Regions:
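Small/polar-rich, solvent-exposed N-terminal microdomains that initiate assembly or binding
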Residues: 1-50, 84, 88-89
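Short N-terminal helix-initiation segments at or just after the protein's N-terminus
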Residues: 1-9, 55-67, 82
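Residue-level detection of beta-strand scaffold positions
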Residues: 14-15, 60, 74
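Generic structural motif
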Residues: 29, 44-46, 65-67, 121-125
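Mid-chain, well-packed structural core segment of small domains
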Residues: 64-86
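Acidic-leaning, charged glycine-interspersed low-complexity segments
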Residues: 82-125
C-alpha cells in the first residue's frame, strides 16, 4: 500500500501531462531553491475508516510568482483530484473542503504560497 501523499503526487503529475502545468514540480518536499511553480503535497495521518479504506486529510501548497498563479495552480490541482479515481485504482473519492487561501511561508518571505485542502479516500488493497 502506498502512502496517500504518494498517490496524490502521482495523480497530479498524470493530470498535468499535456497542460500548461506539465513542468510544475510536484512533491512532498519543497526544494531548497524554488525555480518555477511548485506544488507540495502534505497530509495528516491516514485514518482507517473501514477494514478496506483509509480517509486522509490532504493539504496542497502552491508556490508561485504571484497570488493569481498560485490560485490557478491550486484550482488545477483540485480539478485533478476530483478526477483522480481515473488515474489511480487506489483512489475511491476526493472531497475539497478548503478552497485556496493565502498561506505565507515564514521560511521563504520572498515567495508567494497559497494552500487548499480536502479529504482523500483510498482502498487498501
Amino acid at each position: 500500500m502506498r502512502h496517500p501523499t504518494a498517490v496524490v503526487v502521482s495523480c497530479l503529475k498524470k493530470w498535468f501531462v499535456g497542460s500548461e502545468y506539465e513542468k510544475v514540480h510536484v512533491a512532498t518536499k519543497v526544494p531548497a531553491n524554488i525555480h518555477g511553480p511548485v506544488v507540495r503535497v502534505d497530509s495528516a495521518p491516514p485514518n482507517r475508516e473501514t477494514p478496506i479504506t483509509d480517509r486522509t486529510r490532504i493539504m496542497l501548497q502552491a508556490y508561485g510568482d504571484d497570488d493569481q498563479d498560485c490560485v490557478d495552480l491550486l484550482a488545477a490541482c483540485l480539478d485533478g483530484l476530483e478526477m483522480a479515481y481515473r488515474a489511480d485504482v487506489a483512489v475511491m473519492a476526493w472531497e475539497t473542503d478548503t478552497e485556496p487561501y493565502n498561506f505565507p511561508d515564514p521560511d521563504r518571505p520572498g515567495v508567494v504560497r497559497w494552500q487548499a485542502a480536502g479529504t482523500l479516500w483510498t482502498a487498501l488493497s
